């Protein structure tokens, strides 16, 4: 007779299985396991008296004959494509298997071979996600990298040169000299990186020069002058050289209105930053651009989600970031024109409908680099509380909503910037950039971060203790973030033109450089679970937002999960 075990005992031993449900941290979000790829009775688990031992769950297979370098056992995967329980095999820094790990000589259904050269990471009782991707980084200080990594973000794209006044306001690394220096600085940083050149020019020569120098995209920012002429010139260069264009539009409507910007874009693919407008953009109606099929709309996290504190904190942030003077009435009026409770409230709902597709930080330039994933799932929680279950979900779980929101910080930014062949999801062949979470800390504090197959960050106790767990336990960098282990675990994203110019040799780079690809053919329809195209309008007097004729409004949150309950400061 087979041995029978209660569901509770099974979950405590091997993690949850099909039909089990998990509450995520202190949110109201419920996840349900859709499928279990492990085999009952043949599960693998490491430890004294456990399964991964010689002749049992561990085979004699050497690495050269197919054994993996690392197995993550019994992990609960949350990704845009599904919520499944599986073992995950890693080899040469990449994901090579999602299924059943073990010894094919003694176990049934093995698709991931464990051998003497295999390391084990216990995933049972944990949630596994792809490393987060933040595509709105002001590279103001290198300390942002550690803060982002500690939050579960493993890829950062944006612009800047350090705490220069231009960088404090705009996500641009202007010119070949600065792009080269930032590519060299990336050598010592344990995340994937890509840098945007300045896109504000009316003629192509200086833009092409930056792309050849290693820019993986171009950024149009109103502080440098985002006019119809610069928009057209920048997109024309991008179309020829296959890089993405990101845009922060003209808040003051000096060179035109949102309709003029849409006309200048001419149906070409473009990534619109902080599309609601508080972070900058045509006042008061830039938000309507999210209904365009060629527009990839994102939010930055200071407006995620709408709370009773959102409006109050924005004015001071604006004055500092954009080099404004509170003693000049016109500067104050400029700042105040960007802050509208009506459009911020509508932004929450447009995310829940899948019309806004991406969430990023706007690091140290009105946004918080370590809160991208936190703010994303705070928004999901708020929308469940205020709007109830999505039509695709049931009373049992919020699976569709969870897939929609995880896509906003993983696969969709990867698709938008031409890097989805390498990162953005848990799929075979992709870089093993993975984040392991305890369910009680999901979205706020990762337990372990794997970068290119090596552990780069983990919750760790006192280094002088006799075991790893005594306090103080906090996130610390691990071996994968040090020495020569760093370079092979990370990618630097550049243009194809930079690869053709052999930028790696020119600058003496040790990290692998990868060209972004297919950035000009991606439209909103390609973005996973976030491709809705409502017809959006804004009342110019009241700022009320309508989607397909329906008023979009919600109350600000008075209290949020994933907040002070988890943080001492």
Swiss-Prot record:
Subcellular location: Cytoplasm
Binding-site residues for Ni(2+) 2, renumbered to this chain: 219, 248, 274
Residues annotated as binding Ni(2+) 1: 136, 138, 219, 362
The keyword Cytoplasm is assigned to this record: yes
Enzyme class at the top of the EC tree: hydrolase
Alphabetical UniProt keywords: Cytoplasm, Hydrolase, Metal-binding, Nickel
Gene3D superfamilies: Metal-dependent hydrolases, Urease, subunit C, domain 1
Record-listed E.C. numbers: 3.5.1.5
A single GO molecular function term of this UniProt record: urease activity
Major subcellular location class: cytoplasm
Pathway: Nitrogen metabolism; urea degradation; CO(2) and NH(3) from urea (urease route): step 1/1
Catalytic reaction annotation: urea + 2 H2O + H(+) = hydrogencarbonate + 2 NH4(+)
Pfam families: Amidohydro_1 (PF01979), Urease_alpha (PF00449)
Membrane-spanning intervals of the chain: none
Cofactors required: Ni cation
NCBIfam families listed in its UniProt record: PRK13206.1 (NF009685), PRK13207.1 (NF009686), urease_alph (TIGR01792)
Similarity comment text for this entry: Belongs to the metallo-dependent hydrolases superfamily. Urease alpha subunit family.
Protein name per UniProt: Urease subunit alpha
Encoding gene, per UniProt annotation: ureC
């Amino acid at each position: 007779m087979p041995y029978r075990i209660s569901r509770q005992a099974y979950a405590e031993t091997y993690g949850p299985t099909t039909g089990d449900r998990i509450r995520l941290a202190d949110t109201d979000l419920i996840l349900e396991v859709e499928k279990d790829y492990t085999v009952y009775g043949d599960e693998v688990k490491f430890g004294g008296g456990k399964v991964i031992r010689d002749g049992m769950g561990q085979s004699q297979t050497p690495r050269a004959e197919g054994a993996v370098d690392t197995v993550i056992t019994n992990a609960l995967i949350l990704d845009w494509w599904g919520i499944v329980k599986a073992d995950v095999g890693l080899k040469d820094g990449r994901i090579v298997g999602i299924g059943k790990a073990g010894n094919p000589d003694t176990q049934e259904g093995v698709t991931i071979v464990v051998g003497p050269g295999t390391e084990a990471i216990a995933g049972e009782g944990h949630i596994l996600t792809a490393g987060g991707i933040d595509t709105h980084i002001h590279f103001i200080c290198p300390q942002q990298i550690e803060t982002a990594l500690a939050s579960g973000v493993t890829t950062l794209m944006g612009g800047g040169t350090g705490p220069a006044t231009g960088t404090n306001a705009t996500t641009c690394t202007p010119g070949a000299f600065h792009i080269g220096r930032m590519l060299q600085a990336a050598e010592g940083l344990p995340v994937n990186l890509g840098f945007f050149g300045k896109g504000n020019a009316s003629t192509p020569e200086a833009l092409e020069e930056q792309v050849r120098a290693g820019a993986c995209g171009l950024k149009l920012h109103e502080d440098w002058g985002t006019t119809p002429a610069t928009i057209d010139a920048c997109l024309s260069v991008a179309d020829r050289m296959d890089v993405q264009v990101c845009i922060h539009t003209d808040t003051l409507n000096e060179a035109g209105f949102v309709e003029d910007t849409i006309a200048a874009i001419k149906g070409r693919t473009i990534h619109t930053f902080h599309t609601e407008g508080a972070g900058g953009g045509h006042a008061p109606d830039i938000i309507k651009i999210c209904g365009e099929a060629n527009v990839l709309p994102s939010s930055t996290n200071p407006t995620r989600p709408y709370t009773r504190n959102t409006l109050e904190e924005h004015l001071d942030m604006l004055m500092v970031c954009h080099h404004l003077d509170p003693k000049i009435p016109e500067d104050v009026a400029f700042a105040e024109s960007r802050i509208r409770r009506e459009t911020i409230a509508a932004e929450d709902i447009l995310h829940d409908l899948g019309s806004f597709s991406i969430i990023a930080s706007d690091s140290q330039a009105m946004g918080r680099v370590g809160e991208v994933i936190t703010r994303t799932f705070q928004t999901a929680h708020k929308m469940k509380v205020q709007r109830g279950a999505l039509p695709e979900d049931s009373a049992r779980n919020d699976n569709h909503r969870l897939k929609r929101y995880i896509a906003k910080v993983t696969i969709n930014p990867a698709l938008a910037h031409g890097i989805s062949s390498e990162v953005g999801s848990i799929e075979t062949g992709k870089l093993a950039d993975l984040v392991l979470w305890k369910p009680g800390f999901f979205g706020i504090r990762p337990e372990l971060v794997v970068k290119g197959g090596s552990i780069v960050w983990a919750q760790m106790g006192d280094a002088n203790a006799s075991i790893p767990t005594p306090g103080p336990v906090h996130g610390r960098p691990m071996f994968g973030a040090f020495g020569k282990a760093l370079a092979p675990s990370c990618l630097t994203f550049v243009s194809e033109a930079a690869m053709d110019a052999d930028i790696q040799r020119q600058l003496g780079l040790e990290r692998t450089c990868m060209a972004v690809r297919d950035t000009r053919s991606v439209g909103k329809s390609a973005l996973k679970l976030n491709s809705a195209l409502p017809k959006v309008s804004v009342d110019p007097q009241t700022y009320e937002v309508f989607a397909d004729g329906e008023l979009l409004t919600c109350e600000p949150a008075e209290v949020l999960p994933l907040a002070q309950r988890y943080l001492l400061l």
